[in-house]
Amino acid sequence: FAGFMEHTDVNIGRLVDAVEDIGELDNTIIIYIAGDNGTSAEGGFIGMYNEMTYFNQVTEKVEDLLPRLDEWGGEYTFPHMSAGWAVAFDAPFKWTKQVASDFGGTRNGMIVHWPDGIDSQGEIRNQFSHVIDIAPTILEAASLPEPTSVNGTVQEPMAGTSLMFSLNDADAP
């Protein structure tokens, strides 16, 4: 996960730099959703070097893991952090994605950057949203109607609700 995030961060940085180089950064809406429904606790109390051991009910021991410590995160490993770290990653919420009834298992961070379109800057929002709300948000931001037909194919109405109502009003319901 850390390697994925580092790679993602580098490439998002390249995209942001390119948009800034053409002078359109403040006029570009960037929506970044970080995560995939909370961290995973499959690593148990000590973590695991290879998630296949979990699926095959093989218990990894600390003495098995320590000699491989420098290999963790490499292209031939499928490690999981320990459950303690998983809970820490989901702070301030409780639990992990294995416990969907708690916010640690269901909430992800989202950043919306659009200085020319959002008056509020650097504020936190607590309204609930879903990934299905992103397309309606972009359409409203661009003042575009929802497509009813694409290349002659009639489209079903979009699910989701634009988030524009909450971007300038932290107290919006």
Where do the model's predicted regions map?
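A long, amphipathic alpha-helix that forms part
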Residues: 1-28, 39-41, 45-86
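Short, solvent-exposed turn/loop segments enriched in Gly/Ser/Thr/Pro and often Arg
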Residues: 32-39, 45-47, 100, 153-156
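Structural beta-strand/beta-sheet cores of well-ordered domains, especially the beta-sheet scaffolds
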Residues: 26-31, 89-91, 108-110, 127-130
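Short glycine/proline-rich turn/loop motifs
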Residues: 1, 113-119
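Active-site-adjacent bridging/hinge elements
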Residues: 105-115
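A generic secondary-structure signal for well-formed alpha-helical elements
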Residues: 8-9, 15-23, 37-45, 114-115, ...
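C-terminal cap/loop subdomain of S1 sulfatases and analogous C-terminal strand-loop tails that border
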Residues: 75-103, 118-127, 132-173
